[in-house]
Amino acid sequence: MTSVRKRKMNRSSIKKATRRLKDRQRNINIHSNPIIAANWDKSLTLQQNYKRLGLRAKLGSMAGGQEQKVETLTEIRAKREKSASKVKPSDIEQTEDPAQIPEGEARLIRDEDTNEVVRVIYGTMKVSKDSEASEVENTSVIKQLEEYAQKNSQLKRERTASDRENEWLKSLYEKHGDDYDKMKWDKKLNVQQQSAGELRRRITKWKKVNSIE
């Protein structure tokens, strides 16, 4: 048999407090932009999604709490090999082989007596550009967003009045006609104390939509 306390709890209309089974903050629905919505990964956080798309979640500098990138052994070894393969200035001074001098650099050979340049050896060694100079890359998603923004910025959206606003304007017009000064001083209908010019602009637009002359 259950205790008196348990029976009272079962009869009570107040639900007991239960633990959240799912973190609702992770279920972010992106409705404002179709491109971001199409490329959104629901298994990642907002910060991780923005970083993956090449965007920033905050325009200002982060105050802390950033997720640290954990490098794998393969990435660490690749970095070490890359740093070891870099040509130092001291190495260039000791060689006369163009294949050992990076492209875009040169070695100047001077005369020991006059210190004049007698020979210039231009480097021919190809050097791969550092792709890690910037964390944010101009991905295809960013290109799509730029095209979308450029396309939609040229569209001029006309503001439409709500049903409640239409009823309010209709009441003003039926009561005062085109007398906007009386509309302005109407304390019951013009609760927001809008000016005669503002009321004229709204009524004119409302009359145009409803084909009233």
Curated annotation (Swiss-Prot):
GO terms for cellular component: nucleolus; preribosome, large subunit precursor. Keywords: Nucleus, Ribonucleoprotein, Ribosome biogenesis, rRNA processing. Residues 1-25 are annotated as: Disordered. Residues 1-23 have a biased composition (Basic residues). Pfam families: Nop16. It is found in: Nucleus, Nucleolus. One of its GO terms (biological process) is ribosomal large subunit biogenesis. It comes from the Eukaryota. PANTHER family: HSPC111 PROTEIN-RELATED, NUCLEOLAR PROTEIN 16. Component of the pre-66S ribosomal particle. Belongs to the NOP16 family. Involved in the biogenesis of the 60S ribosomal subunit. This is Nucleolar protein 16. It comes from Scheffersomyces stipitis (strain ATCC 58785 / CBS 6054 / NBRC 10063 / NRRL Y-11545). The lineage of its organism: Eukaryota, Fungi, Dikarya, Ascomycota, Saccharomycotina.
